[in-house]
Amino acid sequence: MGGRVSKAVACCCCRSQHHGVVVESSEKTAEEDHGESYELPAFQEFSFEQLRLATSGFAVENIVSEHGEKAPNVVYKGKLDAQRRIAVKRFNRSAWPDPRQFLEEAKSVGQLRSKRLANLLGCCCEGDERLLVAEYMPNDTLAKHLFHWEAQAMKWPMRLRVVLYLAEALEYCTSKGRALYHDLNAYRVLFDDDCNPRLSCFGLMKNSRDGKSYSTNLAFTPPEYMRTGRITPESVIYSFGTLLLDVLSGKHIPPSHALDLIRDRNFNMLTDSCLEGQFSNEEGTELVRLASRCLHYEPRERPNVRSLVQALAPLQKDLETPSYELMDIPRGGATSVQSLLLSPLAEACSRKDLTAIHEILEKTGYKDDEGTANELSFQMWTNQMQDTLNSKKKGDNAFRQKDFSSAIDCYSQFIEVGTMVSPTIYARRCLSYLMNDKAEQALSDAMQALVISPTWPTAFYLQAAALLSLGMENEAQEAIKDGCAHETSSSSGH
């Protein structure tokens, strides 16, 4: 009866409570298997200003972490120089009081490079600010795909792939001297552009002084951690066992309850009903047996990561099918710009038609500024403010007359005073720079407009035009798609 676990598993589980299993190691190292030929830039230290700009001023719209703004440490999505997508974790100010310890830990984790990890690209340590920068994974978490799916449940071959890749990630980290992973759970497993599962690098870093390695419900923490408050490599294996249960059941079942179900041979409660007919008794038996070994009360009786990999590898199915097909998700943002219904401005920017862009910006005026360029408090009415307004008016007139060099000068005067903030001014100066073949300055202005207004489609479209001028077509298409997504969301009232 496929999709149900046979009663024979009870015998396996009972035996595993008393006997460890010795597995011969394979000849290949974890690095050769999972880290080879994976090229990324070297770890670097970023300035706070770089990351502020990359995340549009740490905009709420860019938060991707589970609990949003309420989380003690918030994760944002962003783009470095409008090119590489990144995830930025901003720590609570009290999380890392010792800047030297933070830098040492970050640099150590930043040496890891594997296609099984969402790798750490860099960090920032300025004043009280502590931030980590990692590869951005666009296709959600394992928790989302297992517990909160919408269209369809994750297929059995994909579930097997997830746990194998996760075991390989842990094996690679262990081979590099980073065997400890803090609070391993379904939210730590992310999916990349190709929908391949990756282990978040953030769990590899922990401030030893804060005394907490598990933020989840205590029902899921290893028993030895409850006794000693310390995490060991065997504790990570225990957490891996809870993930095996998640994958098998499609639910977040407390380990003690799961072990009771196994002892009582109540396997129907342990397996996801959505998997009916997708796997054999033998496959289910092996996964439950492996989970029960990982959840052994005695840490020394749990398997090591290499034996996990060797146990899971033979179970793999549909090896030639890409993960994005198993998940029924378009590959790497596979939606082409050509297939999108583009607004006139998006169309003009996608063709880098600067004349058409100018006409649209001139016609739109300052409608998108929501009054930021016009609402002045009483105390602002000074001679300096009058000069500022005059520079704006002169800039607008030059922009209208297509005297783009003068427009740049006048808008720059307005921006330098800094008493008013206008995304439209940056948009107009951006186009003026493009008209003068200054694409890098144009890109900077488009990004600054996004800092002021993080969901403004015009800023994304102008960013695309600047990227096209720099010969960065793929990045330009991503910017167009981002702008279209925000424009669609705005028009639908979300």
UniProtKB/Swiss-Prot annotation:
Its main location: membrane. Pfam families: PK_Tyr_Ser-Thr. ATP binds at H67, G68, E69, K70, A71, P72, N73, V74, V75, K89. It is found in: Cell membrane. TPR repeats lie at residues 423-456. Changing S215A: Loss of its function in the regulation of brassinosteroid signaling. It comes from the Eukaryota. Phosphorylated at Ser-213 and Ser-215 by BRI1. Phosphorylation at Ser-215 is required for its function in the regulation of brassinosteroid signaling. Phosphorylation by BRI1 disrupts the interaction between its TPR and kinase domains, thereby increasing the binding between its kinase domain and BSL1. Induction: Induced by 24-epibrassinolide in roots and leaves. It catalyses: L-seryl-[protein] + ATP = O-phospho-L-seryl-[protein] + ADP + H(+); L-threonyl-[protein] + ATP = O-phospho-L-threonyl-[protein] + ADP + H(+). GO terms for cellular component: plasma membrane. InterPro entries: BSK (IPR045845), Kinase-like_dom_sf (IPR011009), Prot_kinase_dom (IPR000719), Ser-Thr/Tyr_kinase_cat_dom (IPR001245), TPR-like_helical_dom_sf (IPR011990). Its EC number is 2.7.11.1. Residues 61-316 form the Protein kinase domain. A lipid is attached at G2 (N-myristoyl glycine). One of its GO terms (biological process) is positive regulation of brassinosteroid mediated signaling pathway. The active site is at D183. Probable serine/threonine kinase that acts as a positive regulator of brassinosteroid (BR) signaling downstream of BRI1. Interacts with BRI1 and BSL1. This is Probable serine/threonine-protein kinase BSK3. It comes from Oryza sativa subsp. japonica (Rice). The gene is BSK3.
